[in-house]
Amino acid sequence: MDFEQISCSLLPLLGGKENIASAAHCATRLRLVLVDDSLADQQAIGKVEGVKGCFRNAGQMQIIFGTGVVNKVYAAFTQAAGISESSKSEAADIAAKKLNPFQRIARLLSNIFVPIIPAIVASGLLMGLLGMVKTYGWVDPGNAIYIMLDMCSSAAFIILPILIGFTAAREFGGNPYLGATLGGILTHPALTNAWGVAAGFHTMNFFGFEIAMIGYQGTVFPVLLAVWFMSIVEKQLRRAIPDALDLILTPFLTVIISGFIALLIIGPAGRALGDGISFVLSTLISHAGWLAGLLFGGLYSVIVITGIHHSFHAVEAGLLGNPSIGVNFLLPIWAMANVAQGGACLAVWFKTKDAKIKAITLPSAFSAMLGITEAAIFGINLRFVKPFIAALIGGAAGGAWVVSVHVYMTAVGLTAIPGMAIVQASSLLNYIIGMVIAFGVAFTVSLVLKYKTDAE
């Protein structure tokens, strides 16, 4: 594969060198921010050698090349275009200017929660393992190993406000370590542990107001709102305080002001917001049942196209941290939608006689089965439309099933086949059945529907 030739072929189809604002890449895609998106010929780009798909998302033109290939294309492209290399964050900042308000909020929440996902996944995996061990009586819960593993499994959720405080402050333009400190204030030992409230808690009289001394372990919205406020306070103080005193007074006053406001106003309000969202969702799932799963599973992939799905991380983390819920009942539904995209995409492989399309569909379908759906959605299913519709139907069917049989997960971030690692032990079989339903329905509908499957 001639990467220099590929780069030279792409440039005129993207509107020329002058139309490239920035370039970056992820594991599979070349991410370009264009000055004028209308100058790009997406159909022609899709026909360039090595290109597995092309789509616009999050203010960027994203061209799918695949793992390993994209790095070499990127190096050749930046040289051919005569532009300096941009980091993903720089490209994202430029692209953000093109986003609508909803997409900006989704991007903001994504940037806050994605770095935390490994910690939540690790805790979720351990919770799932311990749940299985306890269910089948393999180890005595009083065993030292079990107790230590239990400590490891709950740690990420106990300090979740601290983790969020760090990443949120960085995103809001504040000092990440002050954000983490504020998260520490909200989980201070002087406050009754949020999961132990049933045993009772005390209140504090603050100038006539009775303040409930309840911690915010596992919560999301209180620390998000508190750190947003803290970042504003910090910026204002840095403008007002002389440089000679900035290092001492700014962090001191920021922590004092933000800490008081967080404990007295923002914390309780944020808890009410989070509990309200969790209550609405859990009520909808419990009362609408499989109909809610049908609706959510069918619409999830449509939401993915907009990029707003990244904001769901905050809601899911809130469900896990809520003492009255403690499980993620949304992620199994999203998992069914992702598997369905893989099934619909694989059907195209059986239908098409175009060698280039065949080369794209198989890895794209496999990727979707691992929970990464961009290549399947944008490279194949949306391209031919009807496979995408088939995937929506499959996702709806799978979503209806997992809700009707109460499939729950213990973490966020993993879907499809990898999601099996964080499914509750009692739900694992039904989760697998759900994947078979979603995949089978999407595959069958995509195979039966009539549509052209050539590169033209």
Swiss-Prot record:
Domain PTS EIIC type-1: 107-456
Lipid bilayer topology: Multi-pass membrane protein
Keywords of the record: Cell inner membrane, Cell membrane, Kinase, Membrane, Phosphotransferase system, Plasmid, Sugar transport, Transferase, Transmembrane, Transmembrane helix, Transport
The enzyme's E.C. designation: 2.7.1.211
Keyword set includes Metal-binding: no
GO cellular component: plasma membrane
Function: The phosphoenolpyruvate-dependent sugar phosphotransferase system (sugar PTS), a major carbohydrate active transport system, catalyzes the phosphorylation of incoming sugar substrates concomitantly with their translocation across the cell membrane. This system is involved in sucrose transport.
Protein name: PTS system sucrose-specific EIIBC component
Encoding gene per record: scrA
